[in-house]
């Protein structure tokens, strides 16, 4: 905090100087300069090879006297009062080069760039200002001070330079700082708890239900929700909101449903089940339940959970999830003045790791198994192989399926009076569905992240594995294992790890904040405006700005359309569209174009004649449902007159979901992709594996489907840095 205080003092002196008559540039710096500058031990004891920096401190016998460390104020005083060296430098060439190298590293240090925001220096401008500082400092620096700087660890040296850098900017760049001031003030995302004055006027009771899957935490919160006079349930998924809506109404409690695509207002209801983005922070409630609270740290959607925690007008707020964001919730409650209670939960029955894997052969699948694969292609390959080489029938669940189809597949799997006794699913199975799973089998523990194959995060492995076993089902005991023996060690390693503590949670500006910022840049496109906002926004150490890649891609596509207001563009960019699906993007562009021309937006999409006969037709059904879902979402976010075919879209959506369910029941074809094939593996071996999977007809044998190469094993060479739990805390079965 010494650096923060020094910068504050620098700004205050300059702003009150009678010579400059500058208006105050001072910010609440302590909120922005969170990281205290590391301090050297006192008294200062230089390293042995720099023992004799200061000739005045060296005695005739060669003993050095302790000298207090140079601080930022002394450094600035020295360089600001000395003239730049002319002719021969006052520093030896080696020392000069080392100081310049240090200043280059200072200009590339993200921590210094973050702290420079307190001076109204945006991240994009920091390298330029740091370069000017680099040209200014070395010629004025004494040998003693230079050697002192070079003797320090990098972080300490940067912290010592920061106050001098601040003084330099305020002295020499004040006019430029003033230009940045109004821009950065409009992009100020600090102290977000102050955005909700009505919530701050309340002293809320926050109850954190902390525990793993299958521990009863959400059940207890929902019991309190149903018993309250009024309440809201905030879900991460439309599917989960629909499930709570059905259950609560079945209990005789009137409850409405609000999702982006569907709004059902039940007469006389004081309860509502909604998706987290559809939460109203204007309505008062007695009880609110926010599910999967750990999603606050999600890099894309985390802002919605943060908004709920900060803005809910509820006397009682129940947060359900794992402990990863508990520390941050404590800090937020301290900022908001709310009371926090923590209720700890354990699984009803421990999750057991089955040491005997499937040994790379899907013939070892058993009833009640859920095979988890991390790509649509693998899901259908596994389903095809299981149904070809065993007596089992498979249900399928993955993210691109409509919620209605996923519910139908889950119901089919849960029922005991049919032949569908195996589930093949993606990570979408990790939340939102109650499933009678006996054993979770990881087909792979590596996934494609859009660039390369990476290990599945330990937290995600825990979430998915925890779906095995459910209280009250025919499989109360949960088992988990892997398809390949080589993957088992990584599974065990993930389950042993404690939950990783989140460092920050997400924020994203509301439309009013973007609108206020846009006044500063009337000539920028919306895409450029988003870039400029991110570049200039300031957040404190508890928060981060959520990623906006999908929003920016949509914004870029819509730039060619004339006649859209800023708010129109903002809303269209949040529409639920799969940016990797060209057909879905085309329809969004068409919707926006028609809207901009004040024309009624048509669906312009025919109803399929029947269920899919191949994977191309199945993909087309998925896309059609996504387009209809997007149409319904837009109808709730724009005036109804512009989207008049809501009833038709709802009917088509239901019919297509039914066709998808019928298509999945008879799916027995080789999977394809929405786009042309892209390289998805890191080495030739993996490519060979994928080719082998594609050519099932060539590789099928009486021995069944096999994949003998582990995709996680190469990553196992790198040990995870986080400490593991005692292995005795895990349960194993042969």
UniProtKB/Swiss-Prot annotation:
The keyword Hydrolase applies. ATP binds at residues 211-218. Its EC number is 3.6.4.13. It is found in: Nucleus; Mitochondrion matrix; Mitochondrion matrix, Mitochondrion nucleoid. It comes from the Eukaryota. SMART domains: HELICc. Residues 62-76, 695-709 have a biased composition (Basic and acidic residues). Residues 684-693 have a biased composition (Acidic residues). InterPro entries: DExH18_N, DEXQc_SUV3, Helicase_ATP-bd, Helicase_C-like, P-loop_NTPase, RNA-DNA_Helicase, SUV3_C, Suv3_C_1. Glycans are attached at residues 594, 614, 699. Residues 1-60 form a transit peptide. Residues 58-88, 667-734 are annotated as: Disordered. Residues 198-356 form the Helicase ATP-binding domain. Gene3D superfamilies: 1.20.272.40, 1.20.58.1080, P-loop containing nucleotide triphosphate hydrolases. Major helicase player in mitochondrial RNA metabolism. Component of the mitochondrial degradosome (mtEXO) complex, that degrades 3' overhang double-stranded RNA with a 3'-to-5' directionality in an ATP-dependent manner. ATPase and ATP-dependent multisubstrate helicase, able to unwind double-stranded (ds) DNA and RNA, and RNA/DNA heteroduplexes in the 5'-to-3' direction. Plays a role in the RNA surveillance system in mitochondria; regulates the stability of mature mRNAs, the removal of aberrantly formed mRNAs and the rapid degradation of non coding processing intermediates. Belongs to the helicase family. This is ATP-dependent RNA helicase SUV3L, mitochondrial.
